[in-house]
Amino acid sequence: MKKLLAIAAFSFSALFASAQNSEAYFLSQPCLTPDGQTVVFSFEGDLWKADVANGNATRLTAMQGYETNARVSPDGKWIAFSGRQYGNADVYIMPVAGGEIKQLTYHSAGDEVSSWGWDSKYIYFTSTRESRGSGYKVSINGGTPVRVFGNYFFQYDHNLFEHPSSGEIFFNDTWESSNQVQRKHYKGPFNPDIQSYNPATKKYKRYTDYIGKDFGATLDKKGNIFFISDEANNEYNLYTFDNGKKTPLTTFNSSIKNAIVNADGGKVVFEKDYQLYMYDVAAKKAEKLKINIIRNSILSKEKDFDVKGNITNFDVSPDGKKLAFTSRGEIFVSDVEGKFIEQIKKGSAERALEVKWLSDNKTILFNQTVGGFLNWFTIAADGTA
């Protein structure tokens, strides 16, 4: 008996571990804490965080709508993100450890978070409130957002990222690095470059002049610049500047997305093939982060189902003792006198249309749409098969 219990316990533990350790896909828009030990990302419309070492992820948000564009403040205390609780994207912040969420912007236009100021007191974001898209910043205490470049520069500026010491604001200003970022191999007059503008000195600087795509500059606290380009092999890869020279860091044959360096430097996280990867600057290599999604499981709740006035099709069994019928797409069986009614779980969310008893008085024939086609199926009247 003890041996049997031990085997059962081991089997359950192995099954639980297998379920929890399966690698997750469709993770997006990652960022890192300043020390590079924790990754924050979007999954199934919510924000999650995971320990880089063991990959175990827990949910941070459960708001209505999608939460995206998470960015951790340089001091490691806050997460800024875009939330769509009211339909359009607004800027929100919350503690890195989880806790109270505070809304910072309230405009009916979309506000997409880009990055933090290095003092961790304000957030850069892109908004369509005055044009097709422009860069703004807002205090963590709220208040009226301020347009970063004023009213006379770069009418489509986005991907804003502040240099830690020079005062430069790095940005892109073409739709090819915004709503057409998925269009690879583009070469033409609207190609994005790595460029910056200093609002204090009013000096503009362009760092790249490749006819293809260079975009998404991200900087660490030492001013090291990382960005995405498709110059080497027509696929988006991670690049940096080595003594001012554009230098590839990865040579993937499938494109990366949304690269962000940690504030302290040394780690760059990004998306690739629907999973998360991290590039180690010192080791000069990228590795996949094995993220394990740990969900808060729920137990489905039984609901009352009123069939009165909602019966659409029925059939009496050959022995005259039972009645099968459909109501709101579900199958029910009752005795002919209506003393009991039982729902038959058909194992599909598709609605059943018609029911018919077979001659054995135990089997029900019904039709429903599966895979786009209407077909016939059978099910036991007691719901056992």
Language-model segment annotations:
Residues 286-292:
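Short, solvent-exposed beta-strand-terminating loops
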Residues 20-24, 42-48, 61-68, 80-92, ...:
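A flexible loop/linker signature enriched in serine peptidases of the S9 family
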Residues 31, 71, 115-117, 161, ...:
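Conserved beta-strand position repeated across blades of beta-propeller domains
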Residues 21-35:
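Short N-terminal segments immediately surrounding and downstream of signal-peptide cleavage
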Residues 57:
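Glycine/alanine-rich phosphate-binding loops at beta-alpha junctions
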Residues 1-22:
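Bacterial Sec-dependent N-terminal signal peptides
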Residues 34-35, 74-75, 118-119, 164-165, ...:
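Residue-level detector of Asp-centered blade-edge/turn motifs that repeat once per structural unit
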Residues 27, 306-315:
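Signature of short aromatic-glycine-proline-rich micro-motifs recurring in repeat-based ectodomains
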